[in-house]
Amino acid sequence: MSLIVTRFAPSPTGYLHIGGLRTAIFNYLFARANQGKFFLRIEDTDLSRNSIEAANAIIEAFKWVGLEYDGEILYQSKRFEIYKEYIQKLLDEDKAYYCYMSKYELDALREEQKARKETPRYDNRYRDFKGTPPKGIEPVVRIKVPQNEVIGFNDGVKGEVRVNTNELDDFIIARSDGVPTYNFVVTIDDALMGITDVIRGDDHLSNTPKQIVLYKALNFKIPNFFHVPMILNEEGQKLSKRHGATNVMDYQERGYLKEALVNFLARLGWSYQDKEIFSMQELLECFDPKDLNSSPSCFSWHKLNWLNAHYLKNQSTQELLKLLKPFSFSDLSHLNPAQLDRLLDALKERSQTLKELALKIDEVLTAPIEYEEKVLKKLNQALVMPLLEKFKLELNTTNFNDESALENAMHQIIEEEKIKAGSFMQPLRLALLGKGGGIGLKEALFILGKTESVKRIEKFLKN
């Protein structure tokens, strides 16, 4: 098997979105799984729309999710001389020509074609032009598309694709200002970089016949193509910002782990048996572009949250502390290692994202300012206050380093007072945490420690 060489080639006109990252992941996995090469190319020939910030954000996103590319990043804006050489080569070989048709003439032609209910297209009128060029017109360069031929290629996702060249006009490869067009520079760079396999969105499927025309005209080897269907929302519509089509780095800010996001995106449009959870190593062992799905995949927040919760639960205390650094939450320095472990172990089981985990840390470590009204209204104060007073005294002799001792202290009150567990546990939870739900009470007491637990109970009794 020859060396697999893939690439990801975004345009820096906006931030890297989920669909783009998925494409990058597929290309990365295919190359790395076969000990091949994976390149990053920035397609920045549209100088008027390029953004340095967007280009840097793409690189930042790659670093975050761990996609390591080979060699230096290739910037198309630095390769204009190379493109000019190949345009001139096609002109010299009579495979391309200057077209002097003005925009006014082209618009008029299209209107006539529409009136005749024909597909609007350039009519190749300058294809064999040998006369004197009209004055005042900066020509474009068009490729001579072979006529009456069938361009066929076996797409790795779509299957056999066939297009008659008569459906194509002699498309532009260099604009009147000399700037080469997208299809031209993509073909040149893929060929010169030795790209063997192109995995990209199926919105590029219509570009492929044009690129094959160029590959053949320049005697370049044609790569294998895999055109992946787009990602839809759960209603079967195109992704919007509300449904997930946001900057990749927004997911980091929302508290998603890179392992979860990569796993989630790799499974959007690719399947392997019935397996859902994949480490990067497992993805490298299992990924094959032949298993890419031909039907659109659906973005599911529920699925992403489920995966993220899975990876969150498997993080150690030290790993979580590193991951939590970008998020603001209560100071943890007063907790001993055992309390810190217990806090994060208890809360990571109840959290789906790092952001949610940070909020829950605050909820536990910040003393309640107010108490959940609907729970408070249900309490029988005449019964509750003496129970909490008695328990507060009991805590003075309880070993707070032993959760079983804390649990025994609570059950002792229940047994001595011959009451239902909820009659005591609910007000105690309200006193400690300010609400009716949350982590277990023995965990809460252990994490808060004796001084803070007694302090919160006293505050509740006073209020």
Curated annotation (Swiss-Prot):
<keyword id="KW-0547">Nucleotide-binding</keyword>
<dbReference type="InterPro" id="IPR004527">
    <property type="entry name" value="Glu-tRNA-ligase_bac/mito"/>
</dbReference>
<dbReference type="GO" id="GO:0006424">
    <property type="term" value="P:glutamyl-tRNA aminoacylation"/>
</dbReference>
<comment type="similarity">
    <text>Belongs to the class-I aminoacyl-tRNA synthetase family. Glutamate--tRNA ligase type 1 subfamily.</text>
</comment>
<dbReference type="Pfam" id="PF19269">
    <property type="entry name" value="Anticodon_2"/>
</dbReference>
<feature type="binding site">
    <location>
        <position position="241"/>
    </location>
    <ligand>
        <name>ATP</name>
    </ligand>
</feature>
<dbReference type="GO" id="GO:0008270">
    <property type="term" value="F:zinc ion binding"/>
</dbReference>
<dbReference type="InterPro" id="IPR014729">
    <property type="entry name" value="Rossmann-like_a/b/a_fold"/>
</dbReference>
<dbReference type="GO" id="GO:0000049">
    <property type="term" value="F:tRNA binding"/>
</dbReference>
<feature type="short sequence motif" description="'HIGH' region">
    <location>
        <begin position="10"/>
        <end position="20"/>
    </location>
</feature>
<protein>
    <recommendedName>
        <fullName>Glutamate--tRNA ligase 1</fullName>
        <ecNumber>6.1.1.17</ecNumber>
    </recommendedName>
</protein>
<keyword id="KW-0436">Ligase</keyword>
<dbReference type="GO" id="GO:0004818">
    <property type="term" value="F:glutamate-tRNA ligase activity"/>
</dbReference>
<keyword id="KW-0963">Cytoplasm</keyword>
<comment type="subunit">
    <text>Monomer.</text>
</comment>
<dbReference type="InterPro" id="IPR020751">
    <property type="entry name" value="aa-tRNA-synth_I_codon-bd_sub2"/>
</dbReference>
<dbReference type="GO" id="GO:0005829">
    <property type="term" value="C:cytosol"/>
</dbReference>
<dbReference type="InterPro" id="IPR000924">
    <property type="entry name" value="Glu/Gln-tRNA-synth"/>
</dbReference>
<dbReference type="InterPro" id="IPR001412">
    <property type="entry name" value="aa-tRNA-synth_I_CS"/>
</dbReference>
<keyword id="KW-0030">Aminoacyl-tRNA synthetase</keyword>
<dbReference type="InterPro" id="IPR045462">
    <property type="entry name" value="aa-tRNA-synth_I_cd-bd"/>
</dbReference>
<feature type="short sequence motif" description="'KMSKS' region">
    <location>
        <begin position="238"/>
        <end position="242"/>
    </location>
</feature>
<keyword id="KW-0648">Protein biosynthesis</keyword>
<dbReference type="GO" id="GO:0005524">
    <property type="term" value="F:ATP binding"/>
</dbReference>
<keyword id="KW-0067">ATP-binding</keyword>
<dbReference type="InterPro" id="IPR049940">
    <property type="entry name" value="GluQ/Sye"/>
</dbReference>
<dbReference type="InterPro" id="IPR033910">
    <property type="entry name" value="GluRS_core"/>
</dbReference>
<dbReference type="InterPro" id="IPR020058">
    <property type="entry name" value="Glu/Gln-tRNA-synth_Ib_cat-dom"/>
</dbReference>
<dbReference type="InterPro" id="IPR008925">
    <property type="entry name" value="aa_tRNA-synth_I_cd-bd_sf"/>
</dbReference>
<comment type="function">
    <text>Catalyzes the attachment of glutamate to tRNA(Glu) in a two-step reaction: glutamate is first activated by ATP to form Glu-AMP and then transferred to the acceptor end of tRNA(Glu).</text>
</comment>
<dbReference type="Pfam" id="PF00749">
    <property type="entry name" value="tRNA-synt_1c"/>
</dbReference>
